[in-house]
Amino acid sequence: MIGLVLAAGAGRRLRPYTDTLPKALVPVIEREGEEPTTVLDLTLGNFAHVGLKDVAVVVGYRREAVVERKAALERKYGVTLHLIENDKAEEWNNAYSLWCARDVLKEGVILANGDTVHPVSVEETLLATRGRGQRITLALDTVKQLAEEEMKVVSTPGEGVRRITKQMDPAEATGEYIGVTLIEGDAAADLADALQATFERDPQLYYEDGYQEYVNRGGRVDTAAIGDVRWVEIDNHDDLAKAREIACQY
């Protein structure tokens, strides 16, 4: 099993940082005399902690910034990075971005969005579900009060995920998908097919829409509750301020 980070996104609501950086390299922790700690740093640290020393990173927007930091990140976290090119990062949404990584899915991955700041307990929770026959397992926040913007999930005991979408009454949801998934290698081919059907239908769809397509085709997606932990998806400067507050507590 390897780590996988989707780091191709532009993050235009985080300008001026993202004028020159992909969202995954926006500074989260800054200390005088040290290189800033980014979302990618935090994720690589988590992966290394749970023994995932091979990490694929899907790059696109400002890919050169990741290339420039690659060797230093490998040294710092003791990992080997494999960069995967998303040639449509500024045109299409992330269903295509995850599909670009279809070959590494065969190895089994923990997938992390390049804008999600979360503690290593999330990876540990997902890895603890292995051996139960689950092919795809989503990290789910069942504690947070949900609103309209969140990626909401309806999951049924014994059946797994029935719906995953932002377009849902929060009161109907089991919880929020936080942007971290364990994908076993035997799900790779079916998931890749579902992702391809998703972006071919509409290139602006999310990879979570690909998960829904996978479920609609009869595939099972399970969830793992992460407990009462602090995490944040960084979409804008308010989110970044929250990330800077909580990342120092990990």
Show where each model-derived region lies.
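Conserved alpha/beta core of the MobA/IspD/sugar-nucleotide pyrophosphorylase nucleotidyltransferase superfamily
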Residues: 1-3, 174-250
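Conserved N-terminal catalytic core of the sugar/cofactor nucleotidyltransferase
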Residues: 2-5, 13-16, 32-108, 201
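A conserved hydrophobic helix/loop-capping motif in glycosyltransferases and polysaccharide synthases
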Residues: 4-8, 27-28
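Active-site glycine-centered loops adjacent to acidic/histidine catalytic or metal-binding residues
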Residues: 9, 115, 236
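Conserved beta-strand segments of alpha/beta enzyme cores
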Residues: 24, 80-82, 160, 220-222
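A structural signal for short hydrophobic beta-strand segments in well-ordered beta-sheet cores
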Residues: 25, 153-155, 223
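Conserved beta-loop-beta/alpha segment of the NTase-like Rossmann-fold superfamily
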Residues: 67, 74-151, 155
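Conserved core of the sugar-phosphate nucleotidyltransferase
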Residues: 119-198
